[in-house]
Amino acid sequence: MKKMAVQVTGLSFSYPDETKALGNISFSLEEGESLGIIGPNGAGKSTLLLHLNGVLKKDGGVRIFDEVIGKQNIKKIREKVGMVFQDPNDQLFMPTVFDDVAFGPLNLAMEKEKIKEKVTSTLAQLGLSGYEAKNPSHLSLGERKKVSLATVLVLEPQIIVLDEPTANLDPGSKKSFIRTLKKINKTKITASHDMDSIYDLCSKVILMNKGRIVARGSAENILRDKELLEANNLEVPSRLRS
């Protein structure tokens, strides 16, 4: 029997200026499943993602592998839930690719030889062998996104959370990154406006608008519903258009 990887129950959240970002969000995800979160700008997608590894905290609203996220276990939760942000510049700040990918393991006090081994194998997994000495700022956006992903995968999380993973990528880089993500055999949660990517990556979909879930179901059913998507400023994936 599969474990329940994520359980969100009645999650509501308002920012300090009283802007309501989430209203009574509930969903669950089994280990190994891939969930897409879609919706127009301002729907609350990114705010929801930030609750899944405790960047934003609301007591009792989120469980990761049946453990309630709280101040007492935030480090443990972040070891289980790896987050890849939309902009690689939010994750890459060291002078070399090796240093960026090694940063997390170094903070966990791993031995230097173990760190080198893990960084090398993670970069190889993503097709980045030989990139260790390169400066991330000199790489293409697609390459920087892969390095950002490597900084998460090197820590071996059980859940990968991705915020707009294909944003601003050219068609070739987008296809390459999607192929990379599909090979990662972990529980994945992806928020995106890119319906083609959601169709490629996700088996289940939640549609959000104005901080609430307005529809949920299989990716096949939700992403074929032209009327539903257009009502929420989204489009049917190109491969599903008649």
Predicted segment positions?
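The feature captures the beta-strand-to-loop junction immediately N-terminal to the Walker
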Residues: 38-40
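Helix-to-loop junction immediately C-terminal to a conserved catalytic motif
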Residues: 53
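Conserved ABC ATPase "signature" region
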Residues: 113-131
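Conserved ABC ATPase signature
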Residues: 135-139, 143
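H-loop/switch region of ABC-family ATPase nucleotide-binding domains
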Residues: 192-193
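A short, surface-exposed alpha-helical micro-motif characterized by mixed small hydrophobic
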Residues: 198-200
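Conserved beta-strand-loop-alpha-helix hinge in the C-terminal portion
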Residues: 212-235
